[in-house]
Design a protein with these regions (language model features):
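Acceptor-substrate binding/catalytic loop of class I
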Residues: 147, 167-184
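A short glycine-rich, Lys/Arg-flanked "PGG" loop and its adjoining helix->strand segment in the class I
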Residues: 127-142
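A short acidic, Gly/Pro-enriched loop at the edge of an enzyme's catalytic core
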Residues: 102-113
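N-terminal, positively charged/glycine-rich alpha-helical extensions of SAM-dependent methyltransferases
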Residues: 1-18
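Conserved class I S-adenosyl-L-methionine
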Residues: 144-167
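A C-terminal cap/extension of S-adenosyl-L-methionine-dependent methyltransferases
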Residues: 90, 187, 196-252
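Conserved alpha-helix/loop element of class I SAM-dependent methyltransferases that forms part
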Residues: 27-47
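Class I SAM-dependent methyltransferase SAM/SAH-binding core
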Residues: 58-103
Length: 252
């Protein structure tokens, strides 16, 4: 089986905005991500934001609706096309580019904030992505991220449970060996001049609560309620970074 199979994003790009589809789960995750990021940027109005790995534009549109000046980039051309079309439909002014995150086509010190969510574990050279994020950030700009820890628990939950057993995530979408330990990410960020690092757990399982894991096993991450509407599990932002984690750093 091919690992880290990024063709999935091109083949399924039309599902970014379809409720109940795997890619649309990002909309659920973004509620918690952006709430966390907003604790460092109370108002997004006029803030110049780069959304690395924007996909179909879910986070980009959320911030654009809060009057941020948003630019999105992604390696999936079909996802960029979907993002552009959806922004036009909703009369949102967002600039989208089909480019590599390791080689951003932007001037230095252009952005107030850079988002990099569900990206670092997929790219060819995540250290280079960190370097590029630092380059395009203004002094005192904020780097926001989330990614997956390389741990036994992440293999158990993200690979064995969600990919291999319940197939909530398409098998082969991730490569466990490309997951990143928090200390590795912190070391690289600090070496690139991104300091004041804060890391929190982005916890899908309530600290590996067995009742939650059982529910995921039988219902997946996106179960339906009595009205047959998707009702994803609540996410906790806590101190458990053993599977998935998010955070921020500041360019000095």
């Amino acid at each position: 089986m091919k690992k880290n199979d990024l063709e999935y994003y091109d083949l399924n790009a039309d599902n970014w905005w379809t409720e109940g589809k795997v890619l649309n789960l990002s909309n659920h995750l973004n509620k918690y991500r952006i709430d966390f990021f907003s604790s460092y940027i109370p108002t997004w109005q006029g803030i110049k934001v780069l959304d690395i790995g924007c996909g179909g534009g879910l986070a980009s549109e959320t911030l654009a609706k809060q009057e941020a000046c948003v630019t999105g980039i992604d390696l999936s051309l079909e996802s960029i096309k979907v993002a552009q079309a959806h922004a036009r439909k909703n009369h949102l002014n967002i600039d989208y580019y089909w480019v590599f995150a390791e080689n951003l086509p932007f001037a230095a010190k252009k952005f107030d904030a850079v988002l990099c969510c569900d990206v670092l574990e997929h790219v060819t050279d995540w250290q280079k992505v960190i370097s590029e994020a630092h380059r395009v950030l203004k002094t005192n700009g904020l780097f926001f991220f989330d990614t997956i820890n390389r741990s036994f628990k992440s293999k158990l939950i993200m690979i064995w449970l969600l990919e291999d057993i319940v197939k909530q995530i398409p098998p082969g979408l991730h490569d466990w060996h490309k997951f990143i330990k928090p200390e590795e990410l912190t070391y690289t960020m600090e070496n690139n001049g991104l300091n004041n690092v804060v890391i929190k757990g982005f916890d899908l399982t309530g600290g590996m609560n067995w009742q939650t894991l059982t529910n995921i096993l039988f219902k997946g991450l996106n179960p339906k309620n009595k009205d047959n509407k998707p009702e994803p599990f609540p996410i906790k932002i806590n101190e458990d970074s053993s599977v998935w984690y998010l955070g921020k750093a500041v360019k000095g």
